[in-house]
A protein has these predicted regions:
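N-terminal regions that are enriched for targeting/export leaders
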Residues: 1-100, 175-179
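Internal, well-ordered alpha/beta segment that forms a basic, Gly-enriched binding/recognition surface
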Residues: 127-224
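N-terminal, positively charged nucleic-acid-binding surface of large information/translation enzymes
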Residues: 3-34, 113, 118-158
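An acidic- and aromatic-residue-enriched active-site/binding cleft used to recognize and process polar
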Residues: 97-100, 128-133, 238-241
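Aromatic-residue-lined binding/catalytic grooves and analogous aromatic/hydrophobic interfacial grooves
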Residues: 188-271
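N-terminal catalytic cores of NTP/NDP-binding nucleotidyl/phosphoryl-transfer enzymes
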Residues: 89-121, 125
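Short, well-ordered, mixed-charge alpha-helical segments that flank or form enzyme active sites
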Residues: 103, 133-137, 245
Length: 271
């Protein structure tokens, strides 16, 4: 681990305002070069993780991640044959991630892009569920009214409850949770007569009967819905990744080099 010798170059990126437009960075046609560059960097890195090179640790981590993602996904959905039969070193892995909450279409687009890129490049796609973050709100603002006189209302999906990581956040009011789909559909009916929530929320209610964890319930039902739309990704919570042997090795190295890590981190933040 060595300090950065050249400053980072920053570019201002803005989400497009046109309907149906997308911001993709790096562009689709630059992905192959980025993959090749990443592999070269990993192979050339001389960092030693207590007797294990970075390339060896990365290979071990990919294998462990894939095995755990297959096991986790298989607990609530059918696992794609390609992923289930992938080699132990996992080959190419494409990862994305987000908190297990109800998010906007711009975030959801990322999941479809992840699946598309994995298929195109013969990789396995894994969506990392960031369950170490806390739940920011127990309700969402839903538009209603009419085109001429729109109005928004906050629709709760559960009681407020304590501020804890998603990993520990339980469903507190199952009746309130079960009714969220109908209440949301009623609120938005003047704008969208047949909203997607009517099809999606029964999946969330069904998963809620299998688990008392709110984040797990929302993420698994969303993933099930994506699979109906042709997305063949795997998923795994970050909390599960943190239990892997390779993660422990990586963490031990960071702790052993904590002073140097802090120096490099602060230099990069300052840039």
């Amino acid at each position: 681990m060595t300090p950065r010798t050249s400053p980072l170059a920053y570019r201002r990126l803005r989400a497009p305002r046109e309907d149906g437009a997308a911001l993709v960075e790096p562009p689709w046609d630059e992905i192959p070069a980025a993959l090749a560059r990443n592999r070269r960097l990993r192979q050339s890195c001389q960092i030693d993780f207590h007797g294990v090179s970075l390339a060896e640790l990365a290979r071990e981590a990919r294998g462990e991640l894939l095995a755990e993602a297959v096991r986790y996904t298989a607990s609530y959905a059918e696992v794609p044959h390609r992923a289930a039969s992938a080699p132990a070193d996992a080959g190419l892995l494409f990862l994305a991630g987000h908190q297990p909450q109800l998010f906007h279409p711009g975030v959801w687009f990322k999941n479809f892009a992840l699946g598309h890129l994995a298929r195109k490049h013969g990789a396995t796609a894994v969506n990392l569920i960031i369950d170490s973050d806390t739940m920011k709100s127990h309700s969402i603002r839903v538009p209603g009214g009419s085109i001429g006189r729109p109005r928004a209302a906050a629709i709760p999906l559960d009681d407020a409850g304590p501020v804890v990581p998603f990993e520990e956040r339980q469903i507190l009011d199952r009746s309130l949770f079960a009714a969220f789909g109908d209440r949301t559909a009623e609120q938005i009916a003047g704008l969208i007569p047949d909203p997607l929530v009517r099809e999606y929320w029964p999946l969330a209610v069904a998963r809620g009967q299998e688990t008392d964890n709110l984040g797990v319930c929302l993420a698994q039902s969303r993933h099930q819905f994506e699979r109906r739309l042709g997305v063949t990704t795997l998923e795994i919570p970050q909390s599960h990744v943190c239990q892997l042997r390779s993660f422990a090795r990586f963490t031990a190295r960071l702790l052993a080099e904590s002073e140097r890590l802090a120096t490099v981190y602060n230099e990069v933040v300052h840039e």
